[in-house]
Amino acid sequence: MGKLFGTDGIRGIVGENLTADLAFRVGQAIAVVLQEEKGSRPTVVIGKDTRISSDMLESALMAGICDMGGDVKPVGTIPTPAVAYLSRQERADAGIVISASHNPYEHNGIKVFSGQGYKLSDAVEARIEERILSDAPMKHRTRGEIGRRHHGMRQLKRDYIDFVASTIESDLAGLKILADCANGAAYHIAPDVYHELGATAVSYTHLRAHETLANLV
């Protein structure tokens, strides 16, 4: 285990040991290492939870990746498994989830998947961490070498909803369901999944996104 990466990525209290500056540096390092691995411009899928700090960290990560010539596909607020699935489906070089799971809202984290949707190898993770902690400046890209943010990613959420629904064989027609979305990242995925499975009478608790009450993601 490294100085930054724990068993579940980089985690900390936002504004203390997890800052926008660090997230920018993490984005830079990920793009550089992926480019070394691939030999060409990398693409990264990014998702996040509902925490108040997730937007800020997402922006910093995307800026760092683009600064080093990587492209990003932000899919917005979405459950962690969705990023693993979409990274593989989109043939991306990596996926990033901004989340600290069940931890209190002041915490957040940066979890990185491989392009196959699995945990990064220890070797690649170590190279990324070495870049982050190095005092050597990274060479900024210029002109056409700068990375881009892809737009129109709403369809990717739809793809994940369809995938989840396809894995459930039960017909929910006529069932009354109570779903607790815990103010988390599934808050706008769950209703569509239940609808596709035929449920017509569904009640939700903690459905809306809540920046300081994200319980489970």
What is each stretch, according to the model?
Residues 31, 38-116:
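Ferredoxin-reductase
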Residues 1-63, 67-68, 153-177:
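An N-terminal, well-structured beta->alpha segment
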Residues 56, 82, 188-189, 215:
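Phosphate- and divalent-cation-binding pockets in alpha/beta enzyme and binding domains
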Residues 49, 180, 211:
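Acidic active-site catalytic centers that drive phospho-/nucleotidyl reactions
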Residues 13, 108-208:
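Gly/Ser/Thr-enriched, mixed-charge loops and adjacent short helices
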Residues 6-7, 100, 178, 210:
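Alpha-helical architecture
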Residues 206-217:
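Single conserved hydrophobic/aromatic residue that forms the stacking wall/gate
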